[in-house]
Amino acid sequence: MDIEQKLQYLLNSFDKACRQLEKALALPKDEFIRDSAIQRFEFTFELFWKTLKTYCNILGFKADSPRASIKQSFKAGIIKDNPIYLAMLQVRNLTAHTYEEKLAEEIYTKLPSYSKAMQEAIANIRKDFYD
């Protein structure tokens, strides 16, 4: 698979993951839905940063980590200089290594804005790549 095929695969996978996250967020919240939505966010964010990384590589930028992918995506004009992207990374790191009820509640309330920001960035990649 060449890098452009990899990008297409990641874009399709991101779309599927994002739809699953949106489904969880649309349901009435209880602790199981909240935890499911957080888990879906983690998976969606992984696909998000890997998509950023791949597109940055296509553009000639080196991006080997989530943080580097976000920073290079800003330089490439894919994302705006918005602290939400680094906040998402921090939240993903927290959720992957700790579990606290209060933290889970706080994170859950941010998921709709995180989902929207990721979708906007991916839309910019699509527009730039396919136009």
Predicted segments with their positions:
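Solvent-exposed interaction patches of small proteins and small membrane subunits
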Residues: 1-131
